[in-house]
């Protein structure tokens, strides 16, 4: 069916582009955090010899490390912040939330491999599965298959196997990204 090929092609393109963009974003964020952490380490060590308590009051920024799998699903990283200011006798909140800098749509919808696998692929499978059965019924093929002795369960299992293969093909870019990371 042409719809299966279309959904497979679009799904693979979307999943591959999401994986590539997420990997590039992860690399950029790691580089920026490493540079900021290095600068902060230099500032901390450059404060000279002090009483340790006074040095603790001087404060230091610490940066949350990014795990490798954050390329596939960053989680709440964009909403909770990336760094925190540590100082003695005071508890500070996380700072520098990337979602606060983005546009409204960017706060809610970020194209990640996780979004493709958790939302878009299942929706495509539901629509394709419905379309498969509806098209067979409208063309009169379902009764013809039943007259040839094919049980309805076997027909449904065959359609389910096609959809499962399609879902696995759509998950392939994310699985390759996990293997490469």
Which residues fall in each region the model found?
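Transmembrane alpha-helical segments and their membrane-interface loop/helix boundaries
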Residues: 1-108
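Membrane-interfacial segments
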Residues: 25-33, 133-137, 177, 181
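Secretory targeting signals
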Residues: 92-123, 158-181
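Hydrophobic alpha-helical transmembrane segments
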Residues: 52-67, 102-115, 138-150, 173-180
């Amino acid at each position: 069916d042409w719809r299966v090929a279309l959904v497979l092609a679009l799904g693979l393109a979307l999943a591959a582009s999401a994986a590539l963009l997420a990997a590039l974003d992860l690399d950029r964020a790691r580089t920026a955090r490493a540079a900021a952490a290095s600068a902060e380490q230099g500032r901390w060590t450059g404060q000279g010899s002090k009483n340790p308590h006074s040095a603790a009051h001087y404060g230091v920024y610490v940066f949350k490390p990014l795990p490798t799998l954050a390329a596939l699903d960053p989680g709440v990283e964009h909403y909770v912040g990336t760094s925190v200011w540590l100082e003695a006798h005071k508890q500070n909140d996380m700072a520098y939330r990337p979602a606060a800098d983005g546009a409204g749509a960017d706060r809610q919808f970020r194209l990640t491999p996780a979004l493709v696998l958790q939302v878009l692929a299942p929706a495509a499978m539901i629509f394709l599965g419905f379309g498969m059965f509806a098209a067979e019924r409208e063309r009169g093929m379902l009764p013809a298959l039943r007259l040839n002795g094919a049980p309805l369960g076997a027909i449904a299992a065959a359609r389910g196997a096609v959809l499962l293969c399609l879902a696995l093909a759509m998950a392939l870019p994310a699985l390759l990204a996990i293997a490469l990371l």
